[in-house]
């Protein structure tokens, strides 16, 4: 139905779109000037200048795909081996794969089927028998923007510089990869091993394949030389002369917008890859002040792809009649891959020593209210997808025995059950003031999330209300994010009792990575902890089970391990998820472009940019060609 609306309304909207693109300030890029920083050119054999737009303030609407919700603030750099680039359109790693518009990974991850699809590499990666070494080959057709081949040596240099300067690649995968070697076009990845000679974690090596952008060795050496091999200088280099392998490159960027232009010499048009160029010539992202501004632009047809939460999004087509689509035509509208979670702070004895208190609070929370109000039903309920360690996807749901844990699960708003659990544990109100005590003192907790994160704040209000219903005082606290992020990542903090953060969504290493975030002790005591187990929960039995999973290949044994871990999680309740949620939101306006990812075409709704989701750029069609 939405597709029909898109086509019916397109004729009326498209004229307005051309006019709507012009505002008090130019919303599009001007062509590069002669004195702009020199960019690396496309292959010399067929070299052309980037196309010049006749109107300097307006890109051709029927050649431009507009985004919202990805780029916030001005781009800092184009340095793919650096840090703090704030370059979301060109240099960003997502939970479901790297954003490979300009810089490419060896493989692309598809969260819909869990598959790894070759990008720079052929579909031939293979482990040796004991999973200590992986081999793969680089595609013969793969080229850099300067026309030189992408080689195995580029992969090696990307790895070595990452380790040397401790950039994202080096720090993320350094514990799991010992070294990488090149043998012609063959890449040999040597896994890090433990004292027994076993690989530390083969699953994280798979994450490297889809999560580490490959940089050109020659360019890396150029940057290192001009920075005198100083790690800090290399990390902060602007990278204006960067060489790329992807289908788009930088065209224009300031504090108002970022524009990338298609490289018409892109190697991926070879038959061994896509066999054609992506459809849009330009990728543009206006830098909006906030989510409401981006939503307004989406409604007006000034944005094609919007990565923002939009409450009651169905009203945009049901009530407003706008040609706006989501991945699913019905709720939850998107593919829910992650679970925003309330974490208990185990540094507080009242929580660390009382599993009954932890579970009682979790049982009392009205999740249906959270899903209806905070998520406007853009999440399955916990009655539809009972809680576990898994996201709602079919692949993960098949990894544990549902019947074996059914008696431990809860759907929420079970006030009587929660009260009975507290009474049985001796956590009672002894002085008649309506609040329960522990060790002679009233239990007083807070429920915390960043100020301005409105759907999370709505969730914390429901948690606090649940506490009141069962006689446990819970007050809400909403610090500014700049404060919040320094506190919840401090392993010794005692300021926040119940606080929100999301575990990983989908990747080649999931659900293992998420389970480790929920129950593993690897992150306990880690300073500036952005990695997991933010509540500092320790369970030796769970940790031993977690460590077996990366080396387990038998499916039945995997199910047994994940089932045992789910039993521990639902019994101990070190945290509790409040909803299911997409890892990225994906709303599209079909007044100019159509044939976006949907549940019929096998392309994941990763905003046409992340992992295998980039395939969408090759399938788009103009509503009015």
At which residue positions do the language-model features occur?
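Alpha-helical secondary-structure segments
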Residues: 66, 151-158, 185-188, 246-247, ...
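Periplasmic binding protein-like
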Residues: 67, 147, 298, 304-305, ...
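N-terminal lobe/hinge region of extracytoplasmic solute-binding protein
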Residues: 68-129, 243
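Aromatic- and charge-enriched surface segment that lines or borders ligand/interaction sites
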Residues: 123-168, 188, 294, 350-353, ...
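Surface-exposed binding/hinge segments that line
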Residues: 171-227, 590
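Detector for C-terminal structural segments
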Residues: 257, 364-402, 455-464, 489-625
């Amino acid at each position: 139905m939405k597709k029909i609306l898109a086509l019916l309304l397109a004729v009326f909207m498209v004229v307005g779109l051309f006019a709507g693109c012009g505002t008090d300030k130019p919303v599009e890029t001007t062509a590069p000037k002669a004195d702009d920083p020199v960019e690396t050119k496309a292959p010399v054999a067929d070299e052309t200048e980037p196309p010049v737009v006749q109107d300097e303030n307006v890109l051709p609407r029927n050649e431009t795909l507009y985004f919202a919700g990805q780029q916030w603030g001005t781009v800092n750099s184009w340095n793919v081996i650096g840090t703090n680039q704030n370059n979301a359109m060109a240099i960003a790693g997502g939970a479901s794969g790297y954003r490979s518009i300009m810089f490419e990974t060896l493989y692309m991850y598809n969260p819909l089927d869990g598959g790894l699809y070759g990008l720079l590499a052929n579909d031939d990666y293979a482990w040796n028998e004991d999973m200590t070494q992986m081999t793969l080959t680089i595609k013969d057709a793969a080229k850099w923007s300067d026309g030189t081949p992408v080689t195995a040596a580029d992969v090696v240099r990307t790895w070595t510089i990452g380790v040397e300067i401790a950039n994202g690649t080096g720090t993320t995968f350094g514990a799991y990869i010992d070294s990488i070697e090149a043998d012609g076009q063959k890449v040999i990845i040597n896994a890090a091993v433990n004292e027994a000679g076993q690989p530390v974690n083969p699953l994280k090596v798979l994450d490297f394949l889809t999560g580490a952008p490959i940089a050109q060795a020659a360019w890396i050496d150029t940057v290192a030389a001009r920075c005198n091999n100083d790690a800090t200088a290399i990390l902060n280099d602007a990278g204006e002369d960067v060489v790329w392998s992807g289908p788009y490159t930088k065209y224009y960027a300031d504090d108002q917008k970022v524009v990338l232009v298609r490289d018409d010499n892109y190697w991926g048009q070879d038959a061994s890859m896509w066999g054609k160029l992506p459809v849009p010539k330009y990728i543009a992202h206006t830098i909006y002040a906030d989510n409401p501004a981006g939503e307004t632009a989406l409604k007006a047809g000034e944005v094609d792809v919007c990565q923002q939460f939009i409450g009651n999004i169905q009203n945009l087509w049901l009530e407003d009649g706008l040609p706006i689509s989501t991945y699913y035509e019905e709720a939850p509208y998107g593919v829910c891959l992650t679970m925003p979670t309330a974490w208990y702070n185990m540094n507080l004895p009242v929580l660390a020593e009382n599993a009954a208190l932890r579970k009682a609070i979790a049982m009392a929370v009205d999740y249906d209210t959270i899903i209806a109000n905070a998520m406007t039903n853009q999440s399955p309920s916990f009655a539809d997808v009972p809680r576990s360690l898994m996201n709602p996807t079919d692949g993960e749901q098949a990894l544990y025995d549902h019947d074996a844990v059914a008696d431990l699960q809860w759907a929420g708003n079970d006030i009587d059950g929660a009260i009975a659990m507290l009474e049985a544990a001796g956590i009672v109100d002894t002085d008649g003031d309506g609040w329960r005590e522990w060790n002679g003192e009233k239990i007083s907790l807070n429920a915390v999330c960043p100020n301005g994160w409105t759907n999370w704040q709505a969730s914390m209000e429901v948690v606090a209300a649940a506490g009141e219903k069962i006689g446990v005082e819970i007050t809400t606290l909403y610090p500014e994010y700049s404060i919040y992020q320094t506190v919840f990542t401090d392993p010794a903090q005692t300021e926040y009792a119940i606080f929100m953060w999301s575990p990983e969504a989908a990747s080649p290493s999931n659900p293992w990575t998420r389970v480790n975030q929920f129950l593993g002790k690897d992150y306990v005591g880690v300073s500036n902890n952005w990695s997991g187990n933010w509540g500092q929960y320790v369970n030796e039995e769970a940790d031993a089970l977690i460590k077996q999973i990366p080396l387990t290949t038998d499916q039945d044994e995997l199910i047994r391990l994940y089932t045992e871990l789910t039993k521990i999680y639902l019994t101990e309740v070190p945290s509790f998820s409040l909803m299911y949620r997409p890892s990225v939101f994906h709303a599209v306006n079909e007044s100019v472009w159509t044939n976006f990812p949907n549940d019929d075409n096998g392309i994941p709704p990763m905003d046409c940019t992340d992992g295998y989701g980039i395939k969408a750029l090759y399938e788009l069609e103009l509503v009015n060609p």
